[in-house]
């Protein structure tokens, strides 16, 4: 039959084991010696004792050490709230060690060693206690050590934990607002959707409070017409005082607020989310199609405009061609007239040359006649 030995066991075995541990671990000199250094032997440190005894960790090693058990030369360290079931064995072989008591006992032993092993200086004088008695190291005995250890153990003992009160059952209550006649469901003594005036304690819902104080510096109660600068909003921890700081009039702000609520604060529904995503995708596709139709219409209008420009340019080109043909005809006519005139000019030049030759011959003949007549 297994036995569970922990802090909640209502038996005297734990107290007896702790008492045995105290008697075994408490050190006090039995007989006074001339010099404390010659009578006291160095006590083994806890590290040396743990090195000779195998240790086992029960629970999380990172949690604080709660208790230790020594069973058959094996040490079991219980951390945190872990449960420990010692193996079936004789009760006398199970030694329970409270970690806090062990630390207090070690501090008492170290204090006793410092008092008994410190050599007196040449200027030593007894220490006077507040009661007027002179305390000397020679007056210490084992009873003083036991009383000091008991006092340290009592001081280091953990205070008893008071049981936490059971949480109150939550009750949903419907509360009516006298201004907007809306009903709100709140948890009684836990939260509230209503705001009360600090003057009259008349309650209104939060949306009515916002409507009343909007663009005002003070809150005026709609029931008793009292005016106050602050109102109170309550929850299970207390209340918060509210006052108007600044008011901004913009109809787009509530739309932005609801857009944020729609994106972040709506209850999650997978089918609804898929439908909304498909609707958004359909809206995007419709917008893309509309933009594509608009671009096609713009391209068609641009094409028509370009076609008109091409037709106009073709008309201008035809006009230029007609003008070119007309000018070519005029050029041909002028060329023919020029050729005719050039031929006439050439004929006249030839005729003039013939006449000039005749004139020269006639002139030479006349000169000969004149010379012959003169002679």
UniProtKB/Swiss-Prot annotation:
Zinc finger regions, RING-type: 177-225
A biological process from GO: symbiont-mediated perturbation of host ubiquitin-like protein modification
Protein modification: Auto-ubiquitinated.
Transmembrane spans: none
Function: RING-finger E3 ubiquitin ligase that plays an important regulatory role during the initial stages of infection. Migrates to specific nuclear foci early in infection supposely to prepare the sites for viral replication by targeting and ubiquitinating host proteins.
Protein family membership: Belongs to the alphabaculovirus IE2 protein family.
Protein name (record): E3 ubiquitin-protein ligase IE2
Species this chain originates from: Hyphantria cunea nuclear polyhedrosis virus
């Amino acid at each position: 039959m297994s036995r569970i030995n922990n802090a909640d066991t209502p038996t005297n075995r734990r107290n007896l084991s702790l008492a045995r541990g105290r008697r075994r671990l408490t050190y006090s000199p039995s007989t006074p010696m001339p010099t404390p250094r010659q009578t006291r032997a160095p006590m083994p440190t806890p590290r040396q004792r743990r090195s000779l005894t195998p240790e086992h960790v029960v629970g999380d090693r990172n949690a604080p050490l709660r208790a230790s058990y020594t069973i058959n030369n094996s040490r079991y360290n219980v951390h945190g709230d872990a449960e420990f079931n010692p193996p079936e064995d004789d009760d006398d072989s199970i030694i329970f060690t409270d970690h806090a008591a062990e630390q207090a006992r070690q501090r008492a032993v170290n204090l006793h060693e410092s008092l008994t092993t410190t050599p007196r200086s040449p200027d030593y004088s007894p220490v006077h206690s507040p009661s007027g008695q002179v305390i000397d190291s020679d007056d210490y005995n084992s009873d003083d050590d036991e009383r000091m250890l008991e006092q340290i153990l009592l001081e280091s003992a953990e205070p008893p934990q008071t049981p936490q009160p059971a949480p109150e059952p939550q009750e949903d209550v419907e509360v009516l607002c006298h201004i907007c006649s809306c009903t709100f469901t709140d948890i009684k003594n836990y939260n509230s959707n209503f705001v009360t005036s600090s003057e009259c304690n008349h309650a209104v819902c939060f949306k009515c409070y916002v409507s009343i104080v909007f663009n005002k510096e003070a809150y005026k109660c709609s029931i008793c017409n009292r005016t106050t600068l602050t109102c109170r909003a309550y929850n299970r921890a207390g209340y918060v005082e509210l006052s108007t700081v600044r008011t901004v009039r913009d109809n787009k702000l509530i739309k932005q607020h609801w857009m944020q609520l729609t994106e972040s604060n709506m209850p999650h529904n997978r089918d609804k989310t898929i439908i909304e995503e498909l609707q958004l995708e359909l809206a995007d596709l419709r917008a893309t199609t509309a933009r594509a139709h608009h671009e096609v219409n713009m391209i068609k209008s641009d094409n028509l405009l370009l076609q008109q420009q091409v037709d106009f340019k073709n008309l201008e080109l035809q006009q230029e061609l007609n003008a070119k043909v007309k000018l070519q005809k005029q050029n041909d006519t002028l060329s023919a007239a020029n050729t005719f005139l050039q031929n006439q000019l050439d004929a006249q030049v030839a005729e003039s040359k013939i006449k000039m030759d005749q004139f020269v011959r006639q002139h030479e003949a006349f000169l000969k006649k004149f010379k012959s007549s003169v002679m």
